[in-house]
Amino acid sequence: SVALLGCGGGHTPLVPKANITGPTSKGSRAFAATPSVVDLTTVGYIEEEFFVEGTARAFKPDGAFGLDGKWSVLEASSTPYKTRILVRRPRDSSRFSGVVVVEWFNVSSKIDIDVDYHFVHDEILRSGHVWVGVTAQEISISSKGDGSLGKDALGLAAWDPARYGSLVHPGDSFSYD
């Protein structure tokens, strides 16, 4: 299961509502991401993948960007997207700690790599936390094996077209919702 958490109270949401489907079918290949550094089944965890779709927004400055990091922005445009998330969670929901760690996949090699998970997995697994990896950048969907890891390191759409061919990412300026 996936939960979207937010505050109640009759206010306008800061982010447009997303639709989540899944878990996805296995497809013709393994999940496209670096595998967990431990066998998840031996520690009572499972890995599932979900598709997330909705409307993403790009933003533009509303005035000058100051050095304090407190910037005001306006919505510049919006467009549909469909991406995926990878979830590693305790198989037994009673072990869930209530903490969800969300990682924006690193795409320096033009594919999804869970760099942070590699360093914090011991604590996540020991404590019963849920880890969610997010495909947040366009290149990890569209890469054709031209990254630093070579021709076999393909973006999602090329890795498994049957499973990932419907993913749509309008570009990195839409990555922040």
PLM regions and their residue ranges:
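Cap/lid segment of the alpha/beta-hydrolase catalytic domain
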Residues: 105-109, 121-177
